[in-house]
UniProtKB/Swiss-Prot annotation:
Pathway: Protein modification; protein ubiquitination. It catalyses: S-ubiquitinyl-[E2 ubiquitin-conjugating enzyme]-L-cysteine + [acceptor protein]-L-lysine = [E2 ubiquitin-conjugating enzyme]-L-cysteine + N(6)-ubiquitinyl-[acceptor protein]-L-lysine. It comes from Arabidopsis thaliana. ARM repeats lie at residues 406-445, 448-489, 491-533, 536-577, 579-620. This is U-box domain-containing protein 19. The lineage of its organism: Eukaryota, Viridiplantae, Streptophyta, Embryophyta, Tracheophyta.
Length: 686
């Protein structure tokens, strides 16, 4: 996919040219042709790593045609060129051809697509040949004899016609050699043999991939190309092979992790922006999912295109957020928000799910699979025998590879990386500890990885808890919290984590501390929630760690995101399922706070659902005292009716159950002779 500065996109090697309108003036058409020609001629042969001969020939033809267009413009100004249909038709066809040539040249110089364009140089040559011959066809229809042009210009036209008609563009000889080498590398990978590094460097140098950062761009492009559109098995296999090859090159051959100053500044700016933003601002108000295609309504509010389109298709002509009637339902792309979402996704390893996109998760070919294993074995070796700098480089690669790829997680676990990472967790070098902890966090998502991390005696868990409490950097402690979340998904591990005396207090400390941002707090919160959900015996440990007052104080703060509020309310709701948890929540004003949040218009439906669950559990365990206190609140019924009609994931049923409970209480209270709910204990609810 190619992204233009305006935010529009097109698939590589596709040429969506637009025909000039039939009513276009001759002056406008010629001016536009000259502008297009100028853009084409701004490309220089040195910018191209493949198909250089075809490029040179094409640029030469365009340069010649510029003389023709400039003479046309002069003759038009003096009124000697009639704007006949044949003239307009011929020049319009040339305009379309020039648009396609511009697209093709853009593709040939596409940053990140150099390896892909090399392997498709035959197809690229065919495109150059077809477009060049089309120039001859278009000029054939131009009425040269009826237009008063200088003789030398007419000769140039005939010259271009002859040359373009006989165009035999074909792949360059050097390109063919490089392609053969790449296929030879694939063959070696299939047989689990490491290719000669000098041969790989020769190919990489030919296409202009000379730095670690260049490999990153190639990988990003290939991942995008694999994920979009329908492709044949042959195309998927080639793309997968290229992905395995370029990952091998990045990790094994071009190991100097580099970032240009300009790119580094941009990445740091993006990182600062991502850390400061509220991720819920990137969610569609309708679907509550992070938007993949944000658009703006007339009201100024942004929604995901698919969600707002369904809203309009259902007969609604109002803004979902304000309820105001819209004069226009025109949708305008919100490129600013889209760029922020792309930066957020990149920094957090989020793969945006888009319709028609294939998830890039496994190797689709034998060569790619074996290349991945060779890469993993190399990195595992660097952790054991490499010096400090080589170890850091290997750790960074492991961290990157395991961020979103289940395939590389599996390869690295098989290669024995987990054991090496666990050994260096106690490193005095903060860089080593942070990257090792990040790698463990990612590998804890793998089933086999979980087993190896925990170890036979649970020693791995104790190491992670050490980092959680005493890690050199906040980031290391945050990754430790996230690792505990993934590991706690298994009941036995959840029990083992709970039995480590410093584990739960360490998580609560992150939630409570002002030194951590929302992202770190959410990592700790979801870990606590997982420990609570997967091992009920952990509830008393979590209660003893003081989680209830910490969460209630946190939710009262206006500085946290809705996501933190939702996670906090979910834990409180679960704690209220137990009598001691219910008492702790009530004694600290949890009932009043939940009612307040439920009636707020500034929190998400998910947060309100957790509020309903908390209120329901408080009423179930607190008896008539709690139900009575809740029934006295004049706003509660309206909030519950809204929640029951909008509720998802069981939230609506819980709201309805709570409404029924309040109604039954009120009927028993007012009806003659009706029994009152048994009062098992007295609790001050408000």
């Amino acid at each position: 996919m190619i992204h233009t500065p305006t935010g529009s996109s097109r698939r590589i090697l596709t040429f969506p040219a637009v025909n000039p309108c039939e009513s276009i003036s001759l002056t406008t058409l010629v001016d536009s042709l000259l502008q297009l020609a100028g853009e084409i001629l701004s490309f220089k042969p040195k910018h191209f790593s493949t198909n250089k001969r075809s490029v040179k020939e094409t640029l030469r033809h365009v340069q010649t045609l510029v003389i023709f267009f400039e003479e046309l413009r002069i003759q038009i100004r003096v009124g000697s060129i009639p704007a006949g249909r044949s003239v307009i038709l011929s020049l319009s066809e040339l305009h379309v051809i020039f648009q396609k040539l511009k697209f093709l040249l853009d593709d040939c110089t596409r940053d990140g697509a150099k390896l892909y364009m090399l392997m498709n140089s035959g197809q690229v040559s065919a495109h150059f040949r077809d477009l060049t011959r089309s120039i001859s066809t278009s000029l054939d229809t131009f009425p040269v004899r009826s237009v008063d042009l200088p003789g030398e210009v007419n000769e140039l036209i005939y010259l271009v016609m002859r040359q373009t008609r006989k165009s035999e563009a074909r792949p360059d000889r050097d390109d063919k050699r490089a392609i053969d080498s790449v296929y030879w590398f694939f063959n070696l990978f299939e047989n689990r043999i490491n290719p000669n590094s000098d041969e790989i460097l020769r190919v990489l140098d030919h296409i202009g991939v000379r730095k670690w950062r260049d490999c990153v761009k190639e990988i990003d492009f290939l991942r995008e190309e694999i994920s979009v559109g329908k492709k044949s098995n042959i195309e998927i296999e080639l793309l997968s092979n290229l992905m395995g090859f370029i990952c091998y090159c990045r990790c094994v051959i071009l190991r100097g992790i580099d970032v240009d100053d300009e790119e580094k500044d941009k990445e740091e700016d993006d990182l600062m922006m991502v850390r400061s933003l509220n991720v819920d601002d990137l969610r569609c108000p309708i679907s509550l999912e992070i938007m993949s295609d944000p658009v703006v309504l007339e009201s100024g509010h942004t929604y995901d295109r698919s969600s707002i389109t369904k809203w309009f298709a259902s007969g609604n002509i109002t803004c979902p957020k304000t309820g105001k009637t819209l004069v226009s339902t025109v949708l305008v792309d919100n490129f600013s928000v889209k760029q922020v979402i792309q930066s957020y996704s990149k920094q957090n390893g989020v793969v945006m799910g888009q319709k028609g996109k294939k998830k890039v998760d496994v190797a689709e070919s034998l060569a790619a699979e074996e290349a991945g294993k060779l890469t993993a074995e190399f990195l595992a070796g660097e952790l054991i025998k490499g010096d400090e700098e080589e170890m850091v480089k290997a750790l960074v690669e492991i961290r990157i590879l395991t961020k979103t790829s289940t395939f590389y997680r599996s390869c690295l676990v098989e290669a024995g990386v987990v054991e090496s990472l666990m050994k260096i967790l106690r490193s005095d070098d903060p860089r080593i500890q942070e990257n090792a902890m990040a790698g463990i966090m990612n590998l804890s998502k793998d089933i086999a990885g979980k087993t190896r991390i925990v170890g036979e005696d649970g020693g791995g868990l104790r190491l992670i808890v050490e980092v959680l409490n005493d890690g050199a950097r906040r980031e290391s402690r945050q990754y430790a919290a996230a690792a505990l979340f993934y590991l706690s998904s298994l009941g036995d591990y959840s029990r083992l984590i709970g039995e480590i005396s410093d584990a739960i207090p360490g998580l609560v400390r992150i939630v409570k501390s002002c030194d951590y941002g929302d992202s770190a707090k959410r990592n700790a919160l979801i870990a606590i929630r997982s420990l609570l959900m997967n091992q009920p015996d952990n509830h008393w440990r979590i209660l003893a760690a003081g989680i209830v007052p910490v969460l209630l104080d946190l939710v009262k703060s206006e500085e946290i995101s809705d996501g933190v509020t939702a996670d906090s309310m979910a834990i409180l709701a679960k704690m209220a399922e137990y009598p001691d948890g219910m008492i702790s929540v009530l004694r600290r004003g949890g009932l009043k706070l939940a009612v307040k949040i439920l009636g707020s218009s500034e929190v998400s439906p998910a947060t309100k659902q957790h509020c309903v669950a908390l209120l329901l559990n408080l009423c179930h365990n607190g008896g008539s005292d709690v139900v009575g206190s809740l029934a006295k609140n004049p706003s509660i019924m309206g909030s519950l009716y809204t929640a029951s009609s909008n509720g998802e994931l069981g939230g609506g049923k819980k709201a309805s159950a709570l409404i029924k409970m309040i109604h039954e209480f009120q009927e028993r209270k007012t009806g003659p002779g009706e029994p009152v709910l048994e009062r098992e204990r007295f609790v001050h609810a408000w």
